[in-house]
Amino acid sequence: MKVTLPDFRQAGVLVVGDVMLDRYWYGPTSRISPEAPVPVVKVDTIEERPGGAANVAMNIAALGAGSRLVGLTGVDDAARALNAKLGEVNVKCDFVSVPTHPTITKLRVLSRNQQLIRLDFEEGFEGIDPQPIIERIQQALPEIGALVLSDYAKGALAHVQTMIQTAKAAGVPVLIDPKGTDFSRYRGATLLTPNLSEFEAVAGRSKTEEELVERGMQLVADYELSALLITRSEQGMTLLQPGKAPLHLPTLAQEVYDVTGAGDTVIGVLAAALAAGNSLEEACFLANAAAGVVVGKLGTSTVTPIELENAIRGRADTGFGVMTEEQLKHAVELARQRGEKIVMTNGCFDILHAGHVSYLANARKLGDRLIVAVNSDASTKRLKGPTRPVNPLPQRMIVLGALEAVDWVVPFEEDTPQRLIASILPDILVKGGDYQPHEIAGSEEVWANGGEVKVLNFEDGCSTTNIINMIKASTSQS
């Protein structure tokens, strides 16, 4: 699936749900308390971050989309901290203050990146008059492209069915991060996003993929949903829609440090993408990529457009697309699982010029991903002569990796990339110049695998040799 990042600035999303403040106390631990067999933490750093529905709103704002937040808070320092923190990141807060209740707060104590204990300060908001929240939803509907209902079972969504019907009457899609086992509460929603445990608590454990799909489609029918997205941790995500084949998206996470708030990121990106005009399938692809980024961070976190762009282009932690052969094989495997077409080309690319850039842009247009295999310094010297390359391999790869058209850059030591091409087996092998397809290294292997081999023209008047000669001539004249 080929997906480009939308202009999130055109999107408006309202988040309604259980807001909370996440507090983090950090410090070293070097001894056990004499009072009890517990570690003593010397707190040296304190952080406060919006959590729950507030974290969903922050994820939406981090993308550059218009983000509004409605929820229930107390009249206390935690509520003031939430307002201040959210205002700093351009979330428009419209809280309903309840003087009789504290703002929900969760305190985590950490040492050496390990969470030692969590303390919750809360009192459920059940029984609170829902009308102020309903009125705020009605006021926002003309200006938003999606409504997110973030349910942590703290009472803000006690009248969730009224909220769903209010938004549906206005033609606004409703996305819900559910809680508990009573999914009938969410009847008629556009999309539910349970994680696997939440799904199995309602539908039962599935022994096979087919059984999971069958049980999921039954939930879609039973509760009149437009779609169901099951987030499955290391197994990625599965999107189920009536009348359509299941869409399985493998995880893109490289390393997992903390899953706190990952569900908030998923539904936030989903809503922003839908509000920006993406299809549901495209929005799920972007949300899956965002989840892979956020679980690599510690604590409740958000994802920026740059991080998301890097993730969907396979550049999350690869130094502008520069990869080893093994890393490339893994990236290509994931791309193929998403149905993407792989294009591959190669060259020395010693002094990058307009002809190179034009050629690579045209090569990228042939598929969804472009691999550029680059001759090592020793290989370039053997092919081009003792004075080449002008630019060493690391510099050549960094420049290539920074190009919009290029997804992945990989070096090779041989005179030709035939072995590397045979290992990767791209869908389309491309070479620039006056070659015949059968003369191109790796062509036989690509053809044998059912792929294509194409020759593209270079831009006239552009060559590295000409540039070097011009520089030499200019230097001699001076």
From Swiss-Prot:
Tell me a GO cellular component.
Answer: cytosol
Q: Which reaction does it catalyse?
A: D-glycero-beta-D-manno-heptose 7-phosphate + ATP = D-glycero-beta-D-manno-heptose 1,7-bisphosphate + ADP + H(+); D-glycero-beta-D-manno-heptose 1-phosphate + ATP + H(+) = ADP-D-glycero-beta-D-manno-heptose + diphosphate
Q: Which InterPro entries match?
A: Bifunc_HldE, Carboh/pur_kinase_PfkB_CS, Cyt_trans-like, PfkB_dom, RfaE_dom_I, RfaE_dom_II, Ribokinase-like, Rossmann-like_a/b/a_fold
EC number(s) on record?
2.7.1.167, 2.7.7.70
A GO BP entry: ADP-L-glycero-beta-D-manno-heptose biosynthetic process
Q: Give the molecular function GO annotations.
A: ATP binding; heptose 7-phosphate kinase activity; heptose-1-phosphate adenylyltransferase activity; phosphotransferase activity, alcohol group as acceptor
Where does this protein act, in terms of pathway?
Nucleotide-sugar biosynthesis; ADP-L-glycero-beta-D-manno-heptose biosynthesis; ADP-L-glycero-beta-D-manno-heptose from D-glycero-beta-D-manno-heptose 7-phosphate: step 1/4; Nucleotide-sugar biosynthesis; ADP-L-glycero-beta-D-manno-heptose biosynthesis; ADP-L-glycero-beta-D-manno-heptose from D-glycero-beta-D-manno-heptose 7-phosphate: step 3/4
Query: Region (Cytidylyltransferase): which ranges?
Result: 344-478
Identify the catalytic residues: 264
Region ranges (Ribokinase)? 1-318
Q: Signal peptide location in the record? A: none
* Residue ranges of coiled coil: none
Q: Specify the domain of life of the species encoding this protein.
A: Bacteria
Keywords (alphabetical) are:
ATP-binding, Carbohydrate metabolism, Kinase, Multifunctional enzyme, Nucleotide-binding, Nucleotidyltransferase, Transferase
- The positions annotated for binding ATP are 195-198
Family listed: In the N-terminal section; belongs to the carbohydrate kinase PfkB family.
Q: What does this protein do?
A: Catalyzes the ADP transfer from ATP to D-glycero-beta-D-manno-heptose 1-phosphate, yielding ADP-D-glycero-beta-D-manno-heptose.
- What does the subunit section of this Swiss-Prot or TrEMBL entry state? Homodimer.
Matching HAMAP family: HldE
Name-wise, this protein is: Bifunctional protein HldE
Instruction: Provide the species name.
Output: Pectobacterium atrosepticum (strain SCRI 1043 / ATCC BAA-672) (Erwinia carotovora subsp. atroseptica)
